[in-house]
Amino acid sequence: MVTAPSMSPEHGPSGEDTKKASTIVAGCTMDNQIIFDVLSNALHASRILKMSASYQDSLRSMLNRLAPMQIGKYNQLQEWLEDLDNPNDKHRHISHVYGLFPSNQISPYTHPLLFQAAKNTLLQRG
């Protein structure tokens, strides 16, 4: 499950492989991370409020269907569902590391590979 249409907040894919790529895509990583937070928080609240089991099941089902964060060919956290990142793109925005901060979806303790990919993204972006 992904958002569509979607667009990375700051820019589109760049580089030789993406000259014909559209900036409108399906499932930007930041979108999916925000949706994960919203659904996770709703599930947590539904437990506290003792909402129906079927409602909680529907939230869990949506969480399980979300596209996962992915590590790309340059060992970076992918900004898009497709591996369109360019390691030479020194663009100042890093929306796709929302899962690291301000969210807490990426941690060296719970997801060390994603944490390293987020770190690589920060290093590649300069």
PLM segments and residue spans:
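Acidic/histidine-rich catalytic neighborhood
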Residues: 1-45
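Active-site core of glycosidic bond-cleaving carbohydrate-active enzymes
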Residues: 28-126
